[in-house]
């Protein structure tokens, strides 16, 4: 069974907690993965990373932000099937729902 760990500040890592929550397949009800639960320190780390990212992003001029967002949109569209598979796996959604 696959374990899903954390992604904070641009890096994935295995957290310190030994606690996990099951992710269920919505079609069968079976457990398809486990997501690691964060410690208080890891939540604080995620909040700090988000605050640091916001500082840089909020000071970026609107034209640059628009270019970044359009490139993000292009990448999402180009990788829609793979992203839908990942989202379905991580959240227990059916593929059609993951695609929106």
What function would you assign to each model-found segment?
Residues 1-34, 67, 71:
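Terminal low-complexity tails and localization/encapsulation signals of metabolic enzymes
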Residues 32-100:
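Glycine-rich loop-to-alpha-helix module at the N-terminal edge of alpha/beta enzyme cores
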């Amino acid at each position: 069974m696959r374990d899903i760990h954390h992604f904070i500040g641009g890096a994935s890592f295995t957290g310190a907690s030994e606690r996990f929550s099951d992710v269920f397949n919505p079609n069968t009800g079976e457990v398809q993965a486990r997501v690691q639960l964060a410690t208080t320190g890891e939540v604080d780390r995620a909040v700090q990373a988000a605050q640091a990212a916001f500082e840089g992003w909020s000071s970026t001029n609107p034209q640059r932000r628009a270019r970044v967002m359009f490139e993000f949109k292009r990448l999402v569209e180009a990788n829609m099937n793979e992203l839908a598979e990942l989202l379905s796996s991580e959240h227990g959604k059916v593929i059609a729902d993951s695609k929106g």
